[in-house]
């Protein structure tokens, strides 16, 4: 992306199209498998939970859903087949914000953009470190505390 921006060849449409082609086929396969197996294996309450997590996963917000509803290491986590998609939610939220912010910040200068991202990186790392004890679920699931890893 940086190379494309430097060469004035970056396309938001192309960037997001590549993400869609890379992520959606496998995601749709997993969701379809969960629907099919859930129909036969889960009781009505668990099926309702599955449908909610499918919706959240479909709009790339499963990290928020699982943060609000469950803990990653709950006893019943084996009954949440889409629990692992929390990281996909974080990644896609990052992909929504990063290209646009990078494009805008580079208009103010490369040094300025680098400085802002260093500050945001450090803020994210410090926030994650400080919340591990107080709110470990937020520190685990949410973009502000995971952005430094991306």
Located regions from the model:
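Membrane-interface helix/loop caps of multi-pass membrane proteins
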Residues: 1-150
């Amino acid at each position: 992306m940086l190379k494309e921006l430097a060469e004035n060849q970056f396309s938001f449409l192309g960037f997001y199209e590549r993400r869609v082609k890379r992520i959606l086929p496998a995601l749709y396969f997993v969701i379809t498998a969960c629907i099919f197996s859930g129909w036969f294996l889960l009781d009505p309450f668990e099926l309702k939970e599955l449908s909610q997590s499918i919706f959240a996963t479909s709009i790339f917000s499963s990290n928020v859903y699982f943060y609000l509803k469950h803990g990653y290491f709950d006893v019943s986590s084996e009954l949440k087949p889409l629990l692992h998609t929390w990281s996909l939610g974080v990644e896609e939220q990052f992909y929504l914000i990063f290209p646009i912010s990078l494009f805008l910040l580079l208009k103010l200068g490369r040094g300025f953009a680098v400085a802002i991202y260093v500050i945001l990186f450090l803020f994210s790392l410090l926030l994650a470190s400080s919340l591990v004890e107080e709110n470990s679920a937020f520190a685990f699931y949410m973009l502000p505390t995971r952005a430094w890893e991306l």
